[in-house]
Curated annotation (Swiss-Prot):
Protein name in UniProt: Hybrid signal transduction histidine kinase B
Enzyme class: transferase
Annotated positions of the 4-aspartylphosphate modification: D1889
GO CC term (a single one): membrane
UniProt main location, coarse: membrane
Gene that encodes the chain: dhkB
Compositional bias segments (type: Polar residues): 1-10, 242-252, 293-304, 469-492, 1554-1563, 1626-1665
UniProt topology in membrane: Multi-pass membrane protein
Histidine kinase domain segment(s): 967-1188
Domain Response regulatory: 1840-1967
InterPro entries hit by this protein: 2C_system_His_kinase (IPR050956), CheY-like_superfamily (IPR011006), HATPase_C_sf (IPR036890), His_kinase_dom (IPR005467), HisK_dim/P_dom (IPR003661), HisK_dim/P_sf (IPR036097), PAS (IPR000014), PAS-like_dom_sf (IPR035965)
MF (Gene Ontology): ATP binding; phosphorelay sensor kinase activity
Highest taxon of the lineage: Eukaryota
């Protein structure tokens, strides 16, 4: 009795179980007693390792102790009785125990073994009214049984009605529904109920539909064999045990003495490796969050029905016991029930309820189930069995109580369930249920949403981990409660215990710690070892035992998450406190089963992955602890470092490397042994002392040396020597004894094979050692003083020898095993390489195949067995070409190492031939030399080679195409030149409306074709890698303005809006290739215009990133067009393609724009992106990295606006900002527009200028805003409002409610297409889209109209590549770079080419609808010439040149802005009728345009067309030296009949329209009202105006000439311009040109004055003429007195005399007359007469000389006959003043000088003189002008030109242009003829075509230069240059092409097509004037 009381809870549980078994079977009871007695000797082990067998027992229940004592006494008495059957029973017990323990860990094999079993052996379903069998609550079977149950049983053990309710804690197993027929469906096994009634053997997890398939097996209740076993145990024993490594690896140990089984604890180490991937669950659906077995692992109790199945003696005994305990049990039940209710049912077992359709049984409420279980458990501990009630009564009671409890807790559960579900991750036990799982089916789960687990693969359930709050648990089959009150199920709706999981988490941590360290605090079982299957060992009792921690709480709900209780007692309510004295209140029920917390992820993991996650995650924290770190990790690392060979050793063999560890370890051991021997053996210390030193030496040698064999030999030799020496010393110096102490002979001999893996070394050393020790033995034996004993009788010596031998042999075994594995791996690796090789490997002997790999079989379509059987096949059968190699005498070919690779044809078994590559090698196979042939199928390689050849061929063809496109650019451009130039010539003639219309079509088509050619050439350059990126400084604002003006008209013509958004942080001046950036932007804009029909187009400029060297600028072009589908985005940037054929037919274009743009962007280091939504719009973006400017400091738009606002100087701007127009008072911006983007854009500009702005959509919103303005004090400065509106109806007259105490300035913002005058209600206007410069000009008195666009520190163009290059560029949307302003083309859809001359057919509204616009012919490409100084430098050889007064508005223009008005590259040429919109509203300002832009370019002064100026009322007074118009000119709507100038300047005047139609040449603007000539000097910005003498102005003066004192004019110029120089002969009085002949030279300046009109104010102008005014800036020769006064005629006449010879190329001059007095005219006539006399004298002298020359020529006729017929000779005859000078050109072999009679010349001269006093002039053509008298002749042109051109169209065009200009020229058709002409005649200039047959221009130029060096050609006739000037006519505009022209000796170049004569004439005069 005392001994029983000392046992722990584990023994108590065993005793309780033994009590049950003793009532059933005495033999079983005896076995249990034996086990209990054995367990008494191992209490601690039982406490630590078997904690989960029993649930908590209340130690406070004192009456249970007596029962324990009785049970112990009973066991002791029956011990001997059961001894006989121990052997048999032990065997059964081992099987049973193994199965019970291993089944949950690897139960898959058991389940698989049942798949093929029939259902015949299954029991039928139990009766519905069968009574439950009450069993102890704290017995979670089967794992809870510590005792082995001998099978077969002597008596049938009653089973519960439902066999699955024999609790086996199958929570970790989900059985698929397709296995419902398997016998493993018995999930819950109670070992105490092995044999139940035959009618109650059906498992409750089998659904009703399967019950009819089950049969009742025959069971002999009295048998003791297998028939008496549980059917579940039967299937366990028949399971496929061999398939499970776990089942095979486990054997039940037996006690050494008693031979009985040792109870294997549940924490069997199978947990480390026994889990299968089937034990997993999905996270939401298909997973069992409830894990009911944790919450209701209640030990089954015996029911009355089960008792009835027992023998009568046992039945009576158990009934009496139950009846005796009934009152106590009822009292206990009431206490438990009250306790449970007081704790809010937190201790309820949360189990997934069974599907109601599964079995027709009654569910038991969780409360009642726990009460019953507790009652029965208490009764069981008391030793009695009590039947509580019948099945029907119990079912009825359970139903009622379950419904009551469900109704009470349903609402609360619904509120807390969501929170509890998320607490699953923090739970340490296993509890909780997903709300998706409502019922349990045979497969384990069924959900409310219809989820059926059988549709899932059981192998792919995710695994949860409870240890680290992560779910890695196995799915379980929930315990069901049908017909059995013990196995209660509960819906998750009744679970309320998840809110208190902190204590459970603490207990879980203690469990993990105890499992790792081996300690079990608070009775926690280590069997759970940190994974979810610990639930099998959790008893889940409602209460924990209060006294001791004997049994394991195992994560039990009431026990505080594992607080252990006593030996089976039911416990008291006080045990609700866990080990930390924290009240759990049953919360562990909620979280103990929280396996599934994967948050909806159905990820499946393999078994190995599960183990890795399981152990790695949970052991990681302990590995990182200091204790583990310092006690395990660091010591092990230190030991490993000591033993590990260093890197110096460098072992090449892993075998030797591993043995080096052992060698170093052995040396350390020897060191310790020698050291101890030296210390302990005082009389022999000198023998062992050397070993200390030697072992240390050997150790370090082993660390740093790889001579392992040598070191091992020395080590063994030293050990043997010292050992034998010590023995001999003992024999000779010590007292003889009767025995010999253990020697090292065996140890050393074992170490030999361990250290010497080589068999030779090992045998030799072993023999040596053996002989040595045998010799020692002989010596000892011969000494007769000692004798060797066969065995030692000392236990210590024996133990020591065994341990040493064991350790050494273990090392040897491990190393040998590792070596063997490595050898096997190498062999398998070689075999695998042979098998998996892609090369066909065949082994043959003399050509007969002996082996082949699978690649050979696959390649030749034959099996290996067919190759070898019935006879061996020959290799020649598959490789016929090798047959000769196997003939007799030819076998030596395989021995030739230089045989190399053979390419031949292989034949497979089907006869298919293919190309193979064969290599031969020698090898050894089965110990015999064989030949190995490797065969590679090179069919794919051959195909690849063919494809590569085709690719190379295609690339060559593509390169040929590129070369073709590049080289034939001349031929492509030549027809365009003929078309465009011819159209320009025809345009100058008188045409009717039809002719003009079709002529315009010709020009449009030609320019469009030129655009296509430009794209193709650009693409070909990119493909050929010849595209150049030239970087220079430029202004982003300027580039945007140029781009926008090109496309703005097309945008607004389609009804679209264009808006610009520029981020304030964008730098204004950057370094990059502006030309290419602009090309990309224009391509995107053109694309957006093409595909957008409504809405707007938005341009956004952003700064993506910025650093000290680069700025990444992003340009976005967003449209609201048709959009692009996602699948078509990849096709956008393909060359020559559009999205689909539909778009291709609808939209024009080559499909190259986007492709070129992307490639250009990539070349500049940027990128192109596109975002599009079909039907909504697209956004094309490109980023360009731009460098910092080289010419100025980098500044952003925001800093620019801030500087303007603060009045600070701006770096990079040459002129200061003017003051605010509206004083110091504040300004408020108001924007009114219907488009929100337009309003936002302008508001952004105001924000940059730090000015507040409001915007409104319509007039109503604006008036509402005005009504909110409060009246201010009149004494203060009135508020100024700048109202910008695009709605003309909103103005100062129509707007209601304007406060009168404020000032309003109204600005009209109009579309470029609107043709209307500026209404009086508005002060100014600008064109859409609004830009930053427009807002600044409206606010400030700036001194330049192009302030922000041209004043921005113009940077030098890095290479003057387009200098004087007329024609078209390679840029889409780009114009011809004509420096004389002609030949601009046009393209479709806004992609036209600018640079054209002024079109005579263009109305003034087409040119500009602004009253303030001044437009000049685009003489040069502003983009190409950012700094005009570079042009001056390139033309420095010309000397001082005349300056151009370009028409701009303000003085102080910077150098970079002088030619802005000439920039037509960015727009369509003015000569192009289709795209002249570029000049509409080009410049908008608020000041009267009365000043002249002074351009410093030395060659840009020729033929600048200009519109007459429209004057409008200025918005503010001008005080900067700029005179205002008088009242007669302020109103543009009132034409002035009293002033010809006013009439011409009026925008509504018909004359102004006619003036606008003509091409004008403007030098300055004269205002007759103010009598001022406005002049801007770039060298001296202080020049503001040139004030002319004031004269009376009246209608009576219309017919007279206004006198102009030119002396005063020149003084004014000289006073402000130091660089201005007059000629040596200064005029005394100014003279005006007239129609009379002028004796002045060709370089004399002229002042052309427009004629005054008649009283009607009308002037009849030629459609191709317009008035011009030229202000001379430099006089080369002659005097101003030679100038003749202008006069009026009905028609203006172009005067062609010596003074205007430099204007010959232009026919667009309009004579504007300035009145002069009669006195001045008389003075001029006198001066002219004097000059004429001088000229007559000179002419007479020349005639005489010519006559002499003619006589000499007549004397030498042979010389005349030798003149070439192809050379055109021109002879000029110098005639007297009254005789006309004519020039005749012939192409015959002789030259016939032609002269006109003196009378004819005299008559014409007289007529011309008479016409001076007539009020009208006559109009003549150019040819007539040349034939006129000397009045129409300026001077003799002695320059001679050679035209070298192979195209006859160009010959005609150029000849016409040269002839009209009065030049003498010859024609050569190729380079050979050009060289011949140069040898035979002298020329001043050669126009050399570069691309010609026979000899191109480059070769001809080289030849000509060589002739010049050799002095073989004559010098130029004009003597202006020392060598002939050669100008290239090239179709290529690349920088390298131009450099090539210059490198061969050409002086300049012109790019074809040359569209107008101005381009050619400008180039000629550039070099000849």
């Amino acid at each position: 009795m005392e001994k029983s009381e000392q046992t722990n809870s584990f023994e108590s549980s065993n005793n309780n179980n033994n009590n049950i078994d003793s009532n059933i079977n005495n033999n079983l009871e005896n076995n249990n007693n034996k086990n209990n007695n054995n367990n008494n000797n191992n209490n601690n082990n039982n406490n630590n390792n078997n904690n989960n067998i029993e649930n908590s027992i209340d130690k406070n229940n004192k009456e249970d102790n007596s029962l324990v004592g009785v049970n112990s006494h009973r066991k002791h008495r029956t011990r001997l009785k059961s001894k006989k059957g121990n052997k048999h029973e032990t065997k059964k017990e081992i099987d049973y125990k193994d199965l019970l323990i291993k089944l949950p860990h690897n139960a898959v094999s058991n389940f698989n073994s049942l798949e093929n079993e029939s259902s015949d052996n299954l029991t039928p379903p139990p009766p519905i009214n069968s009574s439950p069998l009450p069993l102890p609550l704290s017995l979670p079977l089967p794992l809870s049984l510590p005792l082995p149950l001998p099978l077969p049983l002597p008596l049938p053990l009653p089973l519960p009605p439902n066999k699955e309710n024999i609790e086996i804690n199958m929570e970790d197993i989900i059985i698929p529904e397709n296995k419902i027929k398997n016998k493993n469906n018995n999930n819950n096994i109670d070992i105490n109920n092995n044999n139940n009634n035959n009618n109650e053997k059906q498992t409750s997890i089998i659904e009703m539909e399967d019950l009819d398939k089950l049969k009742q097996p025959k069971i002999n209740e009295g048998s003791t064999g297998k028939k008496g076993k549980s059917h579940f145990f039967s299937f366990l024993q028949r399971g496929d045990k061999t398939n499970s490594s776990i089942l095979k690896s486990s054997e039940q140990p037996t006690h050494k003495k008693t031979k009985t089984n040792i109870n294997t604890p549940p924490d069997y180490p199978i947990h480390y490796f026994g889990h299968h991937k089937r034990f997993s669950s999905s996270s939401d659906e298909g997973s069992d969050n409830s894990k009911s077995q944790h919450s209701s692992v209640n030990t089954p109790t015996l029911s009355r029905h089960n008792i009835d199945s027992l023998p009568e003696s046992q039945q009576s005994q158990k009934q009496s016991q139950q009846q005796s305990q009934q009152p106590q049990q009822q009292n206990k039940t009431k206490q438990i029930q009250q306790t449970i209710l007081n704790n809010n049912n937190d201790n309820l077992n949360e189990v997934t309820p069974i599907k109601k359709s599964s079995l027709p049984t009654l569910e038991v409420s969780p409360i009642q189930s726990n009460i019953i279980n507790n009652q029965t458990t208490e009764k069981h501990n008391s030793g009695g069995f009590t039947a509580l009630t019948s099945a029907s009564a119990m079912n009825h009671q359970n139903q009622r109580r379950y419904r009551e409890h469900h109704q009470i807790n349903h609402q609360q559960q619904q509120q807390q369930h969501h929170r509890h579900y998320h607490h699953h991750i923090n739970s340490g036990g296993s509890s909780g249920s997903s709300d998706k799982f409502d019922y349990v089916s045979a497969t384990g789960l069924s959900t409310k949403n219809g989820f059926n687990p059988k549709s899932l693969d059981v192998d792919h359930f995710p695994i949860s981990d409870k240890r680290n709050n992560i779910n890695i648990q196995a799915p379980s089959t929930p315990v069901q409660s049908r017909n059995y009150p013990l196995f209660t199920t509960q819906s998750p709706k009744n679970a309320n215990s998840a809110s208190k999981s902190k204590n459970k988490l603490k207990n879980l941590k203690r469990k993990i710690a105890s499992s790792i360290t081996g300690n079990n605090p608070s009775g926690i079982s280590s069997s759970a070892f940190n994974h979810s299957f610990s639930s099998w060992n959790n008893n889940n009792s409602v209460y924990t035992g209060g006294n001791s921690g004997g049994g394991s709480g195992g994560g039990g709900s009431g026990g505080g998450g594992g607080g252990g209780g006593g030996g089976g007692g039911i416990g008291t309510p006080s045990s609700f406190l866990d080990d930390n004295n924290n009240l759990n209140n049953g919360e562990n029920f909620k979280n103990s089963n929280s396996y599934n917390n994967n948050n909806g992820s159905n990820r499946s993991i393999s078994h190995d992955e599960w183990l890795r996650q399981f152990y790695h995650k949970h052991l990681e924290r302990y590995e990182k602890t200091k204790a583990v770190d310092y006690l395990i990790i660091k010591p092990w690392n230190f030991i490993s470092w000591i033993l590990r060979p260093s890197r110096i050793a460098n072992y090449q063999s892993k075998i030797l490397y591993r043995r080096a560890y052992i060698l170093n370890f052995l040396n350390l051991v020897l060191f310790v042994v020698y050291l101890l021997s030296t210390i302990l053996s005082s009389n022999e210390w000198f023998i062992f002392a050397p070993g200390i030193l030697l072992s240390v030496i050997y150790f370090f040698l082993g660390k740093i040396n790889n001579k392992m064999y040598l070191i091992a030999f020395l080590t063994i030799s030293t050990a043997v020597a010292i050992n034998i020496t010590s023995i001999i010393y003992d024999l000779t110096h010590t007292r003889p004894t009767d025995k010999l102490i253990f020697s090292w002979d065996l140890l050393v001999m074992i170490m030999v094979p361990l250290l010497f893996p080589s068999i030779v070394y090992s045998i030799v050393i072993l023999i040596s050692v053996a002989v040595t020790y045998i010799g020692l033995g002989i010596y000892v034996q011969s000494s007769h003083n000692f004798y060797l004993l066969d065995a030692y009788d000392s236990f210590g010596e024996l133990l020591r020898s065994i341990i040493i031998v064991f350790v050494i042999l273990m090392f040897y075994t491990i190393l040998s095993s590792v070596d063997l594995k490595e050898i096997e791996r190498k062999e398998s690796r070689i075999q695998s390489l042979f098998r998996i090789s892609n090369e066909a490997l065949v082994v043959h002997k003399d050509g007969l195949i002996t082996d082949a790999n699978p690649a050979f079989e696959s390649m030749f379509q034959i099996k290996l067995q067919d190759l070898l059987y019935p006879i061996q096949s020959g290799i020649w059968e598959f490789l016929p070409a090798l047959e000769g190699m196997f003939e007799p005498g030819a076998s030596k070919l395989f021995d030739n190492p230089d045989m190399g690779v053979i390419e031949t044809t292989g034949i497979d078994s089907s006869g298919r031939t293919f190309q193979v590559e064969v290599r031969t090698n020698k090898a050894t196979y089965d110990g015999e030399p064989v030949d190995v042939i490797s065969i590679i199928d090179i069919t794919g390689r051959k195909q690849l080679m063919e494809a590569d050849y085709a690719l190379r061929k295609a690339e060559a063809a593509n390169e040929a195409k590129v070369i073709f496109l590049t080289t034939v650019s001349h031929e492509l451009r030549t027809p365009i030149n003929g078309v465009l130039a011819s159209a320009d010539i025809l345009e100058r003639t008188t045409l009717d409306s039809t002719q003009k219309e079709f002529l315009n079509c010709i020009k449009l088509s030609g320019n469009y074709l030129l655009d296509l050619i430009n794209d193709i050439l650009d693409y070909s350059k990119i493909e050929a890698g010849k595209m150049e990126i030239i970087k220079y400084d430029f202004s982003i604002l300027k580039m945007l303005d140029n781009s926008i003006r090109i496309v703005s008209k097309n945008i607004y013509e389609k009804g679209l809006d264009l808006c610009i958004f520029i981020d304030p942080n964008v730098p204004v001046i950057v370094n990059g290739d502006q030309r290419r950036i602009k090309q990309i932007l224009l391509n995107f804009l053109s694309n957006s215009i093409k595909f957008t029909n409504h809405g707007q187009i938005i341009i956004r400029v952003k700064l993506e990133s910025d650093d000290s060297t680069h700025s990444l600028i992003k340009f976005d072009v967003e449209d609201s067009g048709i959009g692009i589908k996602t699948e078509h985005l990849n096709q956008l940037f393909a060359s020559f393609s559009q999205i689909d054929s539909g778009n291709s037919r609808k939209y024009q274009g080559t499909g190259l724009g986007l492709s070129i743009s992307k490639r250009l962007c990539k070349m500049m280091g940027g990128d192109v992106k596109v975002k599009s939504e079909f039907g909504v719009g697209s956004t094309f973006s490109f980023t360009i990295p731009c460098g910092i400017p080289n010419t100025t400091t980098r500044f952003s738009l925001q800093s620019l606006g801030s500087a303007i606002y603060m009045g600070e100087d701006i770096q990079g701007i040459n002129k200061p900002i003017g003051k605010k127009k509206y004083g110091a008072s504040g300004v408020v911006g108001i924007v009114i527009d219907s488009n929100k983007y337009t309003r936002k854009s302008i508001s952004q500009y105001f924000a940059i200028l730090k000015i507040s702005c409001v915007d409104f959509e319509n007039k109503k919103e604006f008036e509402n805003y005005l009504s909110t303005l409060a009246t201010v004090d009149q004494t203060t400065n009135p508020q100024v409002y700048l109202v910008i509106t695009s709605i003309i109806d909103i103005n100062q007259l129509t707007t209601n409610g304007l406060p009168r105490d404020r000032i309003y300035h109204w600005i009209l913002m109009e579309s470029p297409n609107e043709e209307r005058k500026l209404p009086l209600e508005f002060e100014n206007r600008f064109v859409k889209p609004a830009q930053f410069a427009d807002i600044v000009r409206c606010l400030y008195k700036i001194d330049s109209i192009n302030f922000f666009i041209e004043q921005m520190a113009g940077s030098p163009y890095k290479a003057s590549k387009d200098l004087q290059s007329g024609g078209s560029s390679n840029e889409s949307g780009d114009g011809g770079r004509s420096l004389s302003g002609g030949g601009g083309g046009v393209g479709s859809n806004g992609n036209g080419n600018g640079g054209g001359g002024l079109d005579s057919n263009i109305s003034p509204s087409e040119l500009s609808s602004s009253e303030h616009q001044l437009i000049s012919t685009p003489l040069s490409d502003v983009n190409e010439f950012e700094d005009i100084n570079l042009i001056n430098q390139s033309l420095s050889g010309l000397g001082p040149s005349a300056k151009v007064l370009n028409s701009t508005y303000f003085n102080g223009l910077s150098q970079s802005s002088k030619i802005y008005n000439n920039n037509n590259r960015n727009g369509v040429g003015i000569g192009n009728h289709h795209h002249d919109h570029y000049y509409q509203h080009r410049h908008h300002h608020s000041l009267p345009p009365e000043e002249i832009d002074y351009d410093e370019s030395p060659f840009l002064f020729l033929n600048k067309p200009i519109r007459k100026v429209y004057h409008s009322q200025p918005s503010t007074p001008v005080t900067n030296g700029i005179a205002l118009m008088d009242s007669s000119s302020k109103s543009p709507s009132i034409p002035s009949s009293s002033s010809a100038s006013a009439s011409a300047l009026s925008p509504n005047s018909r004359h102004s329209n006619e003036l606008g139609n003509g091409k004008t040449t403007q030098s300055f603007v004269f205002s007759p009202t103010s009598r001022k000539f406005s002049l801007n000097d770039s060298f001296n910005p202080s020049i503001s105006t040139i004030v002319l003498p004031q004269v009376s102005y009246s209608p009576s003066m219309q017919g007279g000439n206004f006198p102009i004192n030119m002396e005063s004019v020149y003084k004014k110029i000289e006073s402000h311009n130091n660089n201005f120089k007059r000629s040596e002969s200064k005029p005394s009085t100014p003279t005006f040109l007239s129609n009379q002949p002028s004796p002045a030279t060709s370089n004399s300046p002229q002042l052309l004055q427009s004629p005054t009109t008649s009283t009607t104010g009308s002037i009849n102008l030629s459609p191709h003429r317009s008035p011009n005014i030229r202000l001379p800036l430099e006089v080369r020769s002659g005097s101003l007195s030679s100038l003749k006064p202008l006069r009026e005629d009905e028609e203006l006449e172009s005067i062609s005399d010596d003074h205007t010879s430099h204007l010959k190329g232009s026919s667009h001059s309009i004579n504007q007359q300035i009145p002069s007095t009669i006195q001045q005219q008389q003075q001029q006539q006198q001066q002219q007469q004097q000059q004429q006399q001088q000229q007559q004298q000179q002419q007479q002298q020349q005639q005489q000389q010519q006559q002499q020359q003619q006589q000499q020529q007549q004397q030498k006729p042979q010389q005349q006959q030798q003149k070439p017929t192809t050379t055109t000779t021109t002879t000029s005859t110098q005639l007297p003043q009254n005789i006309e000078k004519t020039t005749t050109t012939t192409t015959t072999s002789t030259t016939k000088p032609t002269a006109t009679s003196s009378s004819s010349s005299s008559s014409k001269t007289t007529k011309t003189q008479q016409q001076q006093h007539h009020p009208t002039t006559t109009t003549t053509t150019k040819s007539e002008k040349i034939e006129k008298t000397a009045a129409a002749t300026t001077s003799e042109k002695i320059e001679k030109i050679l035209l070298v051109e192979d195209n006859f169209v160009n010959v005609k065009i150029f000849s016409k242009l040269l002839k009209d200009s009065g030049y003498i020229f010859d024609v050569a058709h190729n380079g050979v003829e050009a060289v011949e002409c140069v040898k035979k005649g002298a020329y001043d200039l050669i126009l050399m075509d570069c691309q010609m047959p026979e000899m191109d221009g480059f070769e001809a130029t080289t030849a000509i230069r060589e002739l010049e060096k050799s002095n073989l050609i004559e010098s130029p006739p004009s003597k202006k240059h020392s060598h002939v000037v050669i100008v290239a006519l090239t179709a290529n505009s690349g920088y390298k092409d131009k450099q090539k022209c210059l490198s061969v000796g050409m002086n300049d170049f012109l790019q074809k097509p040359i569209k107008t004569s101005d381009i050619l004439i400008q180039m000629i005069k550039k070099h000849l004037n």
